[in-house]
């Protein structure tokens, strides 16, 4: 890949990973518009790692508090709001791990198409709009509970379908279950840590076994750009939804879905 391609794809990953607008929908656009080939496994690992670093550093205080409380809950039997939240995040991760393991090959073979991505981008955009407008939205992350956490986890598993958007599906479910916009976003972001870490380990294992050469300069640049873009995205997204809700992202998803349909059918 040339430098321009690295910059564009890393920006797309960083900006779309944590917004409810589907990163997979955006990653196929350069291929459609510019005829770019697949960026490769090593680049996917690099930009995903950059996004993972961004959410870990942004929520470092919350994650550290949760980790300490989680350890205390196991070692000393001391339970607190942070330890409960940590257990809920772990519980919410399990459905994606299970369904990802059994359905990975089917999804890669049958669902990773522009048509599927276009439809899911539109459909789940409308569901996000409904959840944002019709739900109660007054619970904090510490009021989630294990049942709601598990249901949000199933929504995350549903996001294995390309175009759904992991953050979009989890925020939609959280809003439907009564979490506030800020709480829905924060729970979704915290959920991304174990999922992204697990995915990076699995893909990294495949990469280590691959005989293909590695362009370390491109990977380093992609990681840094993805990190910066994702960090800024998280920061400003939390500010935007507190003022404007999810409507701007719903409108954007509908437009994006229409554009993808145009590429497919015109």
Swiss-Prot record:
InterPro entries: UppP. The keyword Nucleotide-binding does not apply. The keyword Cell wall biogenesis/degradation applies. It comes from the Bacteria. It is an enzyme of class 3 (hydrolase). It is found in: Cell inner membrane. Its EC number is 3.6.1.27. GO terms for cellular component: plasma membrane. Catalyzes the dephosphorylation of undecaprenyl diphosphate (UPP). Confers resistance to bacitracin. This is Undecaprenyl-diphosphatase. It comes from Shewanella sp. (strain MR-4). The lineage of its organism: Bacteria, Pseudomonadati, Pseudomonadota, Gammaproteobacteria, Alteromonadales. The gene is uppP.
